């Protein structure tokens, strides 16, 4: 099935201007256009847009996604390089996750500390 930008935007839950921005930034290298120059999206395009949104939430750099798009245009021979970009980003995410887990433990300890404090106050009143 094919979609114009308004329909595609509704499907992926983004405003059309965001999708246009992604294309301008080189993140959507395979978007086709109809005879009038309107963007045409297929299911694969929508899946990639959804992936971009997910990847951006992880903090990946636009430049890395742009590079992946450029490499994708070059074909399957660039799969190893694309995989390496994702592996590098995964490593950074795992390090960040360790930091977040440590911070979460500290927050949980503080919550427990304050719950104990509240409990002691209630028991003494």
Residue positions per predicted region:
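Short glycine/proline-centered loop/turn elements that form peptide/ligand docking sites
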Residues: 8, 15-18, 35
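Arg/Lys-rich, alpha-helical DNA-contact motif
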Residues: 4-6, 10, 29, 43-125
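Positions that flank functional sites
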Residues: 37-38, 70
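Beta-hairpin "wing" of winged helix-turn-helix
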Residues: 29-36
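Conserved active-site tyrosine of GNAT-family acetyltransferases
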Residues: 22, 41
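Glycine-centered, phosphate/nucleic-acid-interacting loop/turn motifs that mediate DNA/RNA or nucleotide
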Residues: 26
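Flexible coil/turn residues that form the inter-helical turn or adjacent wing/linker of helix-turn-helix
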Residues: 1, 15, 58
């Amino acid at each position: 099935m094919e979609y114009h930008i308004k329909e595609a935007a509704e499907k992926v839950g983004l405003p059309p201007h965001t999708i246009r921005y992604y294309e301008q930034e080189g993140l959507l290298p395979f978007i086709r256009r109809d005879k009038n120059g309107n963007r045409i999206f297929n299911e694969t395009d929508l899946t990639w847009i959804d992936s971009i949104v997910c990847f951006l939430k992880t903090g990946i750099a636009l430049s890395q996604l742009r590079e992946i798009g450029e490499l994708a245009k070059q074909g399957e021979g660039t799969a190893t390089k694309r995989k390496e970009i994702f592996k590098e980003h995964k490593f950074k995410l795992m390090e960040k996750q360790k930091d977040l887990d440590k911070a979460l433990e500290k927050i949980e300890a503080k919550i427990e500390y304050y719950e104990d404090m509240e409990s002691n106050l209630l028991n003494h009143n």
